[in-house]
Amino acid sequence: MDFSPFDNRGYPTLSVRDGYSAWAETYEDTVLDLMDLRVAEALTSVAWHEHAEALDLACGTGRFGAWLRAMGVGAVDGVDITPAMLERAKARGAYRLLMTGEVAAVDRPGEVYSLVCQSLADEHLSDLGPLYAEAYRLAAPGGLFVILGYHPWFLMNGMPTHFRDRSGRDLAIESHIHLFADHVAAALKADWRLAELKEALVDEAWIAAKPKWAVHRGRPISFGWVWRKRA
């Protein structure tokens, strides 16, 4: 769904590659673990330490890949379209392999990974279908696809993914709205089976970190889907 009719910020909008290239230096100073890592920690259908190989789609600076390793995942590969983000991921030393490329066309053989993940990136895709199909191709039989994201409620209330650059300008990154029905349709078309869904709300921990967000108390801020491939 086109985000522009919902936009109430009016920030200049960059492409995904240009936006994350500009944001790479300060990304981890502005993205809170509350957005995705806390949701991942709450998932009960994933025994992270049991996975020998995982793929991190749109791995960015590697913060999620590093979390996966800390949770006991044996080896993590990552792919991202932004070289500046991949440089930071490489510096972490958490990845076995890092690749430059699109999340819907990964240069890896199929049915390799028992765990495929994506965190905070789905809103940058105009169509979820290719993502879910590629994750299914890459997942081993019985494998999982964990997708964590920015809740469409906030996008539909006018707040795109955005950041402040060195000069103090607020800039948005190309965003699209995907209803939960869109996720379900794309997943079922690819033959995934739902294992779990979690939604996170703006709570006291959020408000402590961002006091101005008190006006958003109780609103859904992020989500976590877990999908399972047939064995």
What positions do the PLM features span?
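Class I SAM-dependent methyltransferase SAM/SAH-binding core
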Residues: 55-57, 61-105
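Core SAM-dependent methyltransferase catalytic element
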Residues: 210-231
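A short SAM/SAH-binding and catalytic strip from SAM-dependent methyltransferases
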Residues: 115-127
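A short glycine-rich, Lys/Arg-flanked "PGG" loop and its adjoining helix->strand segment in the class I
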Residues: 129-141
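Conserved class I S-adenosyl-L-methionine
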Residues: 1-49, 63, 67, 144-174, 207
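Short alpha-helix
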Residues: 175-198
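A short acidic, Gly/Pro-enriched loop at the edge of an enzyme's catalytic core
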Residues: 104-116
